[in-house]
Amino acid sequence: MVVGFWWLERHAFQDSYESDSGTAQTIVFPEAYIPSFEGGELIIHDHFQLSYAEQYEQAAWVAYTLDKAHLTGDIRKRPYYIMDPMVSTGSADWRNFKGSGYDRGHLCPAGDRKFSETAYNQTFYTSNISPQDRQFNAGIWNELEQQVRRWARKYGKLYIITGGVLGDGLPTIGTDYVAVPEAYYQVVIRGEGEETRAIGFLIPNTNTDLQPEAFLISLDDLEALTGLDFFPELPEQAQ
């Protein structure tokens, strides 16, 4: 009985993946590149940040920095999905996804945060997941994540903003009515100042045999679709 209770206390009662010491090194995302989203709650974790949209029970955007030094490939024990303790209204419960037919799709990929246990575990907050078609998640979305990692190894530091396209009338899952996006976007930026370059993708939340480059989109068009203002200080020629 003692062993059983210890297991429950350690696992079932886990309510935070924040650093106990408070000394974890924070990976900074440039403030100038943070998109605007009216009504979202800004949440800043050690290794990514997001704007939580309570009406859709998920992030409107997740932003993170990716450097080739982050791609360590360390083996990490997969933690439980838990609610984000920093979301004041409470992020969606992971059980909303049970029996829904949708994957718990990461926005900031767990595979990009294996360089530390805290970084890896924080990606399992439910504020960082969104309902994704299983073939989409395992297929083209994974291919895009792999491509971004190749770019990070080639070019060094990248800044990524990603999320589902949210809006009225979307289907929902679970008792929290988690919205199911019809498409997901990703914006990748490298360089700073006049050397800044950005590329955008918009991919339907369904299976496809096409490659990510088939879904390139300008930032202007992506802003019109999402209602977000990406990189407000980014030079126009970079977009």
PLM segments and residue spans:
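Domain-level detector for secreted/extracellular nuclease and nuclease-toxin modules, and
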Residues: M1-Q239
